[in-house]
């Protein structure tokens, strides 16, 4: 690189100044200047060498960077060519995949049509099979219902017999327990009497011992009181003698006090005269003191009222916090009670509906059974009358047969009455349940019309719970 022109101008100026200074300087000064100039020259040479090295380094770095840049540009051109080739290959692959997708869609459509036809055929076969199975299940269901009705009747007979046996066992156990209770009562009454006698004897002994102890204590107290009375009597006798001596000395003191009183009255008159002179400033000072006392009292009152107000404020804040906490607790309890009420109401509706269905179904079954038994009885009576008229039996045999038939009829009538009683009992329970349900709805403030259906009320009596009266 070429040297800069500014440096030459500065050097020419320095040389001109130096020549001007040399003309008017001595030898020593010139030697000193020569030394300084040599030092500056050495520094400048070092600086020039350093700058030359830096310039060489920069040129070397620039050459290396230029070479790297050309290499990177060549790599970039190669990458661009590779990208173009890859793009062309990618387009070709996309076309191939599109063609494959078309073939797959066509095959998939064919598979869907075949599967749809197979599925429709299988569905039709399954529907036929399910219809057949549904018919078989309907028959089985009807047979099971008939068996269930028969089992219910048999269970009711068994339950009736078990209730009778249970009642007998209960009466027997009650009698046994009553006898045991009587025995235990008599036994413990004897024990109580013996204990009462023992306690009475022990009480009398303890009372006698207590009376003896109290009598000895009373005698000791009387002796102590007598000794104390004698001591007090002697004490007061001594006091009276001492008081007489004291009265004499006091009389002498009174005379001396009278003399002093006269002297003091004279002195008081003089002091009163002096006090008249000092009364006016004293009254002013007393007024100021009274005013200050009033201010102090007002300050104390204000301080006390402030403390009381702070205490009331703290108490009110505590009460507000307690009330807020109670309000939060009550609101949570109210929401909980509301949810419980809704749950109970839902359960109550479900139970009412289930009981209504069960009672309705049971009453309908019992009524149908009673009707069927009545029809069967009428048919049996008609058949029996035909058989008897066709048989032409003798009167004795006919009487025995009639008696036997009457017994059978009586048994059947008893069964019919029991069934009618069960029907009436179930109907009454159903009606009572409906009334309780309506009362609960009224209690919760829910109109009965919002129920959504009207409960079926049967025609039975409205007697007490558990009592069934024939309608």
From Swiss-Prot:
GO terms under biological process: axonemal dynein complex assembly; cilium movement involved in cell motility
Subcellular location: Cytoplasm, Cytoskeleton; Cytoplasm, Cytoskeleton, Flagellum axoneme; Cytoplasm, Cytoskeleton, Flagellum basal body
Coiled-coil region list: 23-239, 282-425
Matches recorded under InterPro entries: GAS8, GAS8_dom
Disordered: annotated segments: 1-24
Effect of gene knockout: Defects in DRC4 give the pf2 phenotype characterized by disruption of the assembly of several other N-DRC subunits and an altered waveform that results in slow swimming cells.
UniProt GO MF annotations: microtubule binding; small GTPase binding
GO annotation, cellular component aspect: 9+2 motile cilium; axoneme; microtubule
Family: Belongs to the DRC4 family.
PANTHER family in alphabetical order: DYNEIN REGULATORY COMPLEX SUBUNIT 4
UniProt name for this protein: Dynein regulatory complex subunit 4
UniProt organism field: Chlamydomonas reinhardtii
Protein's gene: DRC4
């Amino acid at each position: 690189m070429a040297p800069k022109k500014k440096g030459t101008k500065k050097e020419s100026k320095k040389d001109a100044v130096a020549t001007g200074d040399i003309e008017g300087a001595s030898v020593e000064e010139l030697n000193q200047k020569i030394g300084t100039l040599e030092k500056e020259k050495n520094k400048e040479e070092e600086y020039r060498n350093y700058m030359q090295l830096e310039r060489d380094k920069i040129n070397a770095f620039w050459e290396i960077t230029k070479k790297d840049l050309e290499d990177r540009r060549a790599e970039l051109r190669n990458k661009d060519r590779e990208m173009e080739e890859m793009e062309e290959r990618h387009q070709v692959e996309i076309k191939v995949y599109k063609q494959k997708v078309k073939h797959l869609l066509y095959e998939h459509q064919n598979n869907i049509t075949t599967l749809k036809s197979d599925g429709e055929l299988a569905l039709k076969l399954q529907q036929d099979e399910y219809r057949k199975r549904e018919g078989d299940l309907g028959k089985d269901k009807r047979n099971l219902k008939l068996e269930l009705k028969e089992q219910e009747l048999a269970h009711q007979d068994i339950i009736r017999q078990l209730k009778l046996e249970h009642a007998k066992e209960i009466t027997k156990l009650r009698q046994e327990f009553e006898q045991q209770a009587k025995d235990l009562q008599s036994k413990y009454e004897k024990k109580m009497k013996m204990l009462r006698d023992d306690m009475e004897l022990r009480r009398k002994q303890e009372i006698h011992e207590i009376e003896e102890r109290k009598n000895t204590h009373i005698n000791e107290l009387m002796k102590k009181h007598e000794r104390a009375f004698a001591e007090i009597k002697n004490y007061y006798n001594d006091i009276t003698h001492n008081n007489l001596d004291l009265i004499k000395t006091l009389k002498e003191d009174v005379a001396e006090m009278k003399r002093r009183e006269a002297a003091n009255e004279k002195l008081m008159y003089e002091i009163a005269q002096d006090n008249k002179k000092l009364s006016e400033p004293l009254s002013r000072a007393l007024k100021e003191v009274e005013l200050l006392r009033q201010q102090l009292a007002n300050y104390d009152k204000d301080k006390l009222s402030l403390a009381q107000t702070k205490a009331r404020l703290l108490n009110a804040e505590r009460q507000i916090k307690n009330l807020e906490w109670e309000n939060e607790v009550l609101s949570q309890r109210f929401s909980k009670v509301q949810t419980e009420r809704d749950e109970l109401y839902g359960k109550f509706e479900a139970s009412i509906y289930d009981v209504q269905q069960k009672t309705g179904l049971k009453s309908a079954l019992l009524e149908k059974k009673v009707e069927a038994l009545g029809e069967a009885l009428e048919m049996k009576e008609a058949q029996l009358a035909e058989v008897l008229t066709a048989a032409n039996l003798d009167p004795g045999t006919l009487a025995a047969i009639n008696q036997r038939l009457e017994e059978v009829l009586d048994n059947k009538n008893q069964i019919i009455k029991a069934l009618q009683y069960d029907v009436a009992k179930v109907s009454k329970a159903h009606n009572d349940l409906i009334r309780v349900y309506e009362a609960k709805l009224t209690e919760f403030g829910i109109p009965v019309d919002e129920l959504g259906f009207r409960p079926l009320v049967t025609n039975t009596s409205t007697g007490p719970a558990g009592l069934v009266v024939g309608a």
